[in-house]
Structures are given as structure tokens and as C-alpha cells.
Amino acid sequence: RDLVRSRGLGDVYKRQIYYKSETTLPFKADLYPENGFLKGGSTDNVAMEYGLKFHIDWLKGQKTGFFVDQRENRSLLERYAKGRSVLNMFCYTGGFSVYAMRGDAKLVHSVDSSAKAIDLTNKNIELNFPGDTRHAAYAEDAFKYLDRMGDQYDLIVLDPPAFAKHRDALRNALQGYRKLNVKAFEKIKPGGILFTFSCSQAVSKENFLSLIHISEPTRPY
């Protein structure tokens, strides 16, 4: 917080700066996490990313309220979406869904266990594509949704929350990622595409790639 002020970032970011550390800083005795506006104060926020608009909840949203680190992957997905049926699991703000819609996907299904996330996704779809009927959203557990869905998709996005925030949870996390990806592969049509991610710090790139290869089915493509 003091660093933000001392570097004069208030002059760089013209509209507002929201400092959020209560749920993001690791616990240490000498740290005092707190949230609050350093500049501005509006909670009605719409951000623009590559020409698309997104409602963002800085205050109550997960972490920063919008995962900017995925913007290039969202843009990449848009290039593969044309004419495809797309399933966006753990959709949160619906970022991948919005890009798939602009990429002319045949249909887009968004799934998240949080009703608030589904509401936010629907708002972002309507903000960019008012009245478009290609999109449907479901507030449901990801594993249960994959179990009950008989249809297969051309493209699936898996962007779950962290399964392991520390090394002690690594084994269970790897099992969870493998189970999730196995189920996703079962719902992908032959020749389909899987966008799969891990934000678990304890899971290395090598661990993740290995479990993806193990999860991949042996059916011919």
C-alpha cells in the first residue's frame, strides 16, 4: 500500500486504485492485510479488454475481480471457436465464454458452482451480445455437470480454482486435476480441443503436463 503511494501510481492510473490484500497476502505477523480504495471509489466498474466489455467486482470478486493473466489465452480461444460448441467450466466472469461468442461459436455453455459467478457471466454476455441465444449458463458443481451431460463438445475450457495452495496438498490436488481432465476428455468430440489450466502454486509445469498425458484417452482421432 505504501509502495503504491510512494511510486506515484495515482498519477498513472487516472480513474481509481483499489488495494486488496485481506485474501491475497500470505499470513505473516508483520503484515496487516486490508482492503480499500487508494483513489476513486466507484463500485460500478466496466473494463475493456481487446474490444470486449466486462463488469468487474473489485470488492467482493475473487482475488482482483478479473483474471487479466488469462487475456492472451482468451484471445487464442476466440480464434478456435468458429462453428464449434464450447463448454467453459469454472467460468467465473465468463471471460472465455464472451470471447468464444465473438469468435462465432455455434453454442457456448458456462458452468460454475457459484450463482453469483453465473449472474456475472450472464451480465457480461448480455453486455457484449444482447439478446444472443447461443449462450446458456448453469450454476452447478463441475464434476456433477460432466457426469450428467450426455452431449460432447468441440472445445472445453477447464480453469478451476487452486486445488493445492501448499505442498502438503499436492497429492490430492494431482488426483483432482487428473479426475477432472479425464472427465473432460470423455466429453470432447474426436478432434476436439481442450484448454486446461492450473493456478496451484504447488503443482509444477512438469507435474501438470504429466497428469494431462496420463488423462488423455487412447481412442483414435
Write out the residue ranges for each language-model feature.
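Single conserved hydrophobic/aromatic residue that forms the stacking wall/gate
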Residues: 2-13, 213-221
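Non-catalytic substrate-recognition/targeting regions of SAM-dependent transferases
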Residues: 7, 11-67, 75
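Conserved class I S-adenosyl-L-methionine
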Residues: 83-89
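Conserved SAM-binding loop of SAM-dependent methyltransferases across substrates and taxa
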Residues: 93-105
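Conserved SAM-binding motif I beta-strand of class I
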Residues: 107-112
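S-adenosyl-L-methionine
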Residues: 119-151
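Mobile active-site "lid"/loop adjacent to the S-adenosyl-L-methionine
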Residues: 153-183
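C-terminal substrate-binding/active-site "lid" region of AdoMet-derived donor-dependent transferases
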Residues: 179-215, 219
